[in-house]
C-alpha cells in the first residue's frame, strides 16, 4: 500500500501518477481501501464499531477527529448496507471475528476508494455475511468506478463482478 520500501525501487504508476512525482504516502492511501486477515490486530485499543468504521474516513487506526453530521450519516449508511448497524455502539474487541471482519470491510468502503484491496475478506465470515459482501461488491462494480483487487483461496468466495483472474499454483 505504497509504504512498502520495495515500492520505491520499482517503476510504479498509481492513479495515473508515476512514483516520485510529488505524491505522499497519504495521498496514495487516501484512494485505497484495504482489508487483510491481520488488520484487526491494529485495533487493539478497541473503541466502538462505529468509531472503527469512521476511522476509515481518515486512514487512521482510531478516531481522532470529530465527525461532521455528513460523515456520521455516511458511516451509518455503510453500516446499514453491510448489515452491521446493530454493532455501532458495541466494542470492537467484544464482537466475533466475523463481525470484526465485516466492520473492517465497511471501514474500507466508507471512503469510497478508487481501489479496494480485499485479501481473504471472507475468512471468518458465515454464509450470510459472505453473500452480503459479494452482493455489495457486485453492486459497486456495476455502479461505480472502483477497481477491486480480490484475493481468495476459494472460488466460491469470489463475487461475480470479478472479470479477470490470476491463479497461482504450486509447482
Where do the model's predicted regions map?
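Conserved H-loop
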Residues: 145-151
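Conserved ABC ATPase signature
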Residues: 64-67, 91-95, 99
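Conserved catalytic motifs of ABC-family nucleotide-binding domains
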Residues: 112
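Hydrophobic anchor residue at the start of the ABC signature
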Residues: 105
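Conserved ABC ATPase "signature" region
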Residues: 54, 69-87
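Catalytic Walker B motif of ABC-type/P-loop ATPase nucleotide-binding domains
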Residues: 116-120
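ABC ATPase NBD Q-loop/coupling interface
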Residues: 5, 11-27
Amino acid at each position: 500500500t505504497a509504504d512498502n520500501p520495495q515500492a520505491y525501487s520499482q517503476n510504479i504508476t498509481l492513479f495515473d501518477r508515476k512514483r516520485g512525482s510529488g505524491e505522499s504516502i497519504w495521498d496514495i492511501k487516501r484512494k485505497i481501501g484495504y482489508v487483510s486477515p491481520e488488520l484487526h490486530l491494529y485495533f487493539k485499543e478497541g473503541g466502538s464499531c462505529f468509531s472503527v468504521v469512521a476511522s476509515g474516513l481518515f486512514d487512521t487506526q482510531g478516531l481522532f477527529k470529530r465527525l461532521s453530521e455528513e460523515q456520521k450519516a455516511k458511516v451509518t449508511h455503510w453500516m446499514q448496507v453491510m448489515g452491521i448497524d446493530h454493532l455501532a455502539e458495541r466494542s470492537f474487541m467484544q464482537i466475533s471475528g466475523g463481525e470484526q471482519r465485516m466492520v473492517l470491510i465497511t471501514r474500507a468502503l466508507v471512503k469510497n476508494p478508487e481501489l479496494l484491496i480485499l485479501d481473504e475478506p471472507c475468512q471468518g465470515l458465515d454464509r450470510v455475511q459472505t453473500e452480503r459482501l459479494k452482493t455489495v461488491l457486485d453492486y459497486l462494480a456495476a455502479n461505480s468506478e472502483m477497481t477491486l483487487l480480490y484475493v481468495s483461496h476459494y472460488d466460491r468466495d469470489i463475487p461475480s463482478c470479478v472479470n479477470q483472474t490470476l491463479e497461482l499454483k504450486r509447482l
